[in-house]
Amino acid sequence: MITPQIPGQPFQALAAFGQGGVFLTTGSDQAGTGIGQWAAQGSDGFVFSYVNYHFGSDGKLSSVTTVKARGTFNGDSMTGTASQSVAGPTGSAISPAQTVSFSGKRVAAEAP
């Protein structure tokens, strides 16, 4: 579970760091699923990048959110910084890029 520190816009996200570099995320701030890649950096660091496509009610692409992040794992916790940009269907910026810090905690596997 990841919590970005965005003033006035708190939200939570769930991210999966899969074997082979697969990265998936979904959050309470946007519809859709972010899909990308992640890579280890040194003994406890990581980077990830993902895109999240948004479609209008007509089924046409309306915007693309791109996130690039780096951080550190510390046991079952993580911290880092991420930059987010949002572009329209032609690639032109819809809003200025935003950089935020984030923290997160591993979701533990539990028996029923």
Please report, for each region that a protein language model flagged, where it lies by residue.
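Tryptophan-anchored aromatic micro-motifs
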Residues: M1-G8
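Short glycine/acidic-enriched loop and turn motifs that connect beta-strands
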Residues: I6, H54-G56, V86-G88
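Long, non-catalytic architectural segments outside compact domain cores
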Residues: P10-A15, G21-S28
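Well-ordered beta-strand positions in beta-sheet-rich domains
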Residues: Q12-L14, I35-Q37, T66-R70, A97-S103
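Generic beta-strand structural signal
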Residues: F17-Q19, A40-Q41, F73, R106
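Contiguous, well-ordered beta-strand patches that form the walls/edges
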Residues: S28-T81
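Edge beta-strand at a domain terminus
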Residues: Q84-P112
